Amino acid sequence: MSCFPVLFVMMLLVSQSVWAFPGPETRDGSVQDAESRRVRSAEEDCCENPVCKHTPGCPKGS
């Protein structure tokens, strides 16, 4: 049971690195633009949510 938080943090780090370094299949311009727009809108929705607006992706002013 004590290793569960460590695994959870590792999963978060892996998911962050996946978003930060997209694979070669996302290098197509239109696909990458669509992905970035979708991610940006998801981040904006999250930043408007008082529960998770403190996440690192949100601007500090909000």
Swiss-Prot record:
Parts of the chain that traverse the membrane = none
| Compartments in which it is found | Secreted
**What modifications follow translation?**
Contains 2 disulfide bonds.
GO CC annotation: extracellular region
| Major localisation | secreted
Tissue distribution is: Expressed by the venom duct.
Q: GO MF annotations for this entry?
A: toxin activity
Q: Which residues form the propeptide?
A: 22-38
Q: Which UniProt keywords apply?
A: Cleavage on pair of basic residues, Disulfide bond, Secreted, Signal, Toxin
Q: List the disulfide bonds.
A: none
On the tree of life, the source organism's domain of life is Eukaryota
Segment forming the signal sequence: 1-21
Per the record, the similarity remark reads:
Belongs to the teretoxin A (TA) superfamily.
| Domain commentary | The cysteine framework is I (CC-C-C). Alpha4/5 pattern.
Name under which the protein is recorded = Teretoxin Tan1.1
Q: What species does this protein belong to?
A: Terebra anilis (Auger snail)
